[in-house]
Amino acid sequence: MSKSSPIEPVSASDVSQQFRDPGLYLNRELSQLDFNFRVLAQALDEQVPLLERLRFLCISCTNLDEFFEIRVATVRHAQEFGLPPAPDGMRPTVILNAVHDLTTKLVHDQYNCWNQVLCPALAALGVGVLSHNSWNARQKRWLRGYFRNEIMPVLSPLGLDPAHPFPKIFNKTLNIVVVLNGIDAFGRAGHLAIVRAPRSLPRIIELPQHLSRDGSQNFVFLSSVLSAFVGELFPGMVVRGAYQFRVTRNSELVVDEDEVENLALALRNELVTRGYRLAVRLEIAEDCPTPIVRTLLQNFGLQENAVYRINGPVNLSRVSQVYDMVLRPELKYPPFNPRTLRNSDHIFEIIAKGDVLLYHPYDAFTAVLDLLRQAAADPDVLAIKQTLYRTGKDSTIVDALIQAARSGKDVTVVVELRARFDEEANLGLADKLQEAGVQVVYGVVGYKTHAKMLLIVRREGRKLRRYVHLGTGNYHSGTARIYTDLSLMTANAAIGKDVHQLFLQLSGLAPKMKLECLLQSPFTLHAGVLFRIERETKFARKGRPARIVAKMNALNEPQVVRALYVASQAGVQIDLIVRGACTLRPGVQDISENIRVRSIVGRFLEHSRVYWFANNGTPELFCASADWLERNLLRRVEICFPILNPDLAKRIYSDVLQSYLDDNLNAWELGSDGVYRKLLPETDHAPYSAQVALLESL
C-alpha cells in the first residue's frame, strides 16, 4: 500500500441522497435463498460424482436450517419491534411471505432431487436408502427387533391430556405426533401423543449385509423405523396416523455484554436455553391432517407461513452420513495431493528470505501448522499471539499453543466465544488453554473478533523479529481442505508492527492507533474501501482506465453499494465475484451497467476475500477476513492486508481473480432482473473451471 495515499473517510451525504429507489437493491434474505438453489443445482449436475451430489443436497438443507435459525429469526425480530426496512424497501411481513414462497419451492426441489433423482441413482449402483414400503419380510423382522432392543428402551412417549401438556420440543429434533384411538390402562381416552427421538439415536441405520439379496449396501432412516413401529409404544390403542415433524428455533444468542461481568458465564447460561427459544419454522409430513398441523402451530406460536410440508425425512441433511459410510471412491471426487512448502523444517529461514503465499486447499495447510509447531519448540521464540474463531476438535494448533506455554513462552490467544454455533466448543477451548497457562482473552465487548492473525516474536542475535501469519480463513485443518482461502506468512517489519498493535488493542485497553499497512474494522477498513472506490471513480472521470475486481462471500453494505454505483456511472469497470448473498443489482442502465456480478459454486467452498484496484497503473491488491457486509465492516474486528510482493500479487490476480472471471462451468451470472443464470461455454470457448484448472496445476 502506498504511504502517500491517506485513508480518510469519504463523505457519503451526496451518495446517500442519490440511489434511494428500492428497486436498485436486492433483498438480502431472498438473495441468500438464491444461493441455496445454486448449491442444489450441483446435486442435479450429472457431471458431479454421485455421492458428492448427495453432499451438495445435504449442504443445501443445512444452509436452509441456519438461514431460518438466524436470518428468518432476525426478520421476525424486526417485525415484532417495527424496525425500518433495508434499502430494498421490503417490510418484514413482505419478506417473510416472500421467504415462504421461495422456500416452499426450494424444499419441493430438494425432496424431488432426493426422491426422484439421487435415491434411485444410488439404488442402481448398489446403495439403497429404503423407505418403509420397500422393506422385505426379513428386513422388516430385523428392524422390528432393532426397534425393540435399541430404540424403544430410550423412548418416552407423552400422551396429551390436562395432566400432560404439550412438551417442550428441542430445536431441530425428530419428533412423531401420533393419532390414537382407544382406552389406556387408566381408562383414559387417547387422542394425541408425542414421541421425541433422543439425539443419542442414530438417524441413519445400516442394515446387515445378509439381509440384501443382491449385495447392496442398505440404509434406513430412523424416522421410517419410528413411524413403522410406534404402535408398540401404545399397547391396546389403535394408531390412526403417525407423522414426523421438526421445529426450528431462533438460535442467535443474546447477551448484553455491557451488563454482564463474566461473558463466558453469561454465554454458558444462554447455551442452556438456546434450544427452546422462539420457533421460526415447522416441518411436517405432507400427509399430516390439517387439524393436527394447526394444533402444532398453536403450541409453537407460529403462523401458516411458517409451515413446510415435506415428502420424506424431516432432516434430509442426515443422509450425509451415507457419504461417510459408503466406501466407494469411484462415487466421490478423486483425491488430490496439495503442494507442500519446500524445506518447511526451517520455516523461519524461508519466511525471513521473503513473503510466502499459500492458496488453500491447493497449497497444504501443513505449512501453517509447521510454523506454529516450530515456534512452540524453538528456544529463540519468546512470545506467540493468535486469534481463534473456529478450529478443529483435535486441533494441532491448540496442542502447539499449549506446548509453547508449558515451555515457558508468553502465549496469548484471543478466543472468540461468540463464533456462531461454535460457542460451546470455544468455551471448552478457552478452558483448556487457560489450564495450560495460556493467557486467554475474549476480544472486545460488542465486537466479534473475526480477524485471522498469528504473531511470533523471535530473538535473532541482539534483535527481536516478528513473524506473522495472516489469513482469509480460520485456523482449522478440516475446512482448509474444502474451503478456498489465502494465507500470507511474512517477516515484514511494518506489517509485524501493525499486527502487534492490533493484539495490544484486543488484549489490553490500548487507544486507537494508526496502522501503516493494514486496514482494520471497525476503524479504517470501511473508509479505506470507500476511499479506493472513489479513487477509481476520479480516475475514470479524468478519462483514465479504472477498474475494480473484488471477491468475497457476500455484499450488502449500503454505502459500499452506492459507491460502486457512482463508480459505474463514471465508467469504472467493476467485476464482483460474490459467492452468496448480494444486494447490489448489476446491469441497470445509467446506474450499474459497468458492474458484473458472478457466483462460483464448485467442489470447494469459495471463502477467500480479495480486493483489487487498478490505481492508475499501480495496482493495489488486498486480502481480508472481511466481506463487504455491514457487520464485517462496522461491527467486527477484521483485518485487510496488502500483498506487497508484486509477484505474489500477480499470482493472486491470476489464480484467484482472473481465473474465476474466465470460469464458464461453475459460474452463475446475476442479471439486472435479480436472477442468477448458469453460464455455459460459448461455441468458440473451451469449457473451463477455475477450481479444476488449479487442481490440474498441482
Swiss-Prot record:
UniProt GO MF annotations: ATP binding; metal ion binding; polyphosphate kinase activity
Cofactor(s) it depends on: Mg(2+)
CDD domains to which the protein is assigned, alphabetical: PLDc_PaPPK1_C2_like
Post-translational modification: An intermediate of this reaction is the autophosphorylated ppk in which a phosphate is covalently linked to a histidine residue through a N-P bond.
Active site per the UniProt annotation: H450
Top EC class, one word: transferase
Binding site for Mg(2+): R390, R420
BP term (GO), one: polyphosphate biosynthetic process
EC number(s) reported in the record: 2.7.4.1
Catalytically driven reaction(s): [phosphate](n) + ATP = [phosphate](n+1) + ADP
Positions of ATP binding: N63, Y483, R579, H607
Record InterPro entries: PP_kinase, PP_kinase_C_1, PP_kinase_middle, PP_kinase_middle_dom_sf, PPK_C_dom2, PPK_N_dom, PPK_N_dom_sf
SUPFAM superfamilies cross-referenced by the UniProt entry: Phospholipase D/nuclease, PHP14-like, PPK N-terminal domain-like
Keywords annotated in UniProt: ATP-binding, Kinase, Magnesium, Metal-binding, Nucleotide-binding, Phosphoprotein, Transferase
Cellular component annotations (GO), alphabetically ordered: polyphosphate kinase complex
Family, as annotated: Belongs to the polyphosphate kinase 1 (PPK1) family.
Function comment: Catalyzes the reversible transfer of the terminal phosphate of ATP to form a long-chain polyphosphate (polyP).
NCBIfam families on file: poly_P_kin, PRK05443.1-1, PRK05443.1-2, PRK05443.2-2
The name this protein goes by in its record: Polyphosphate kinase
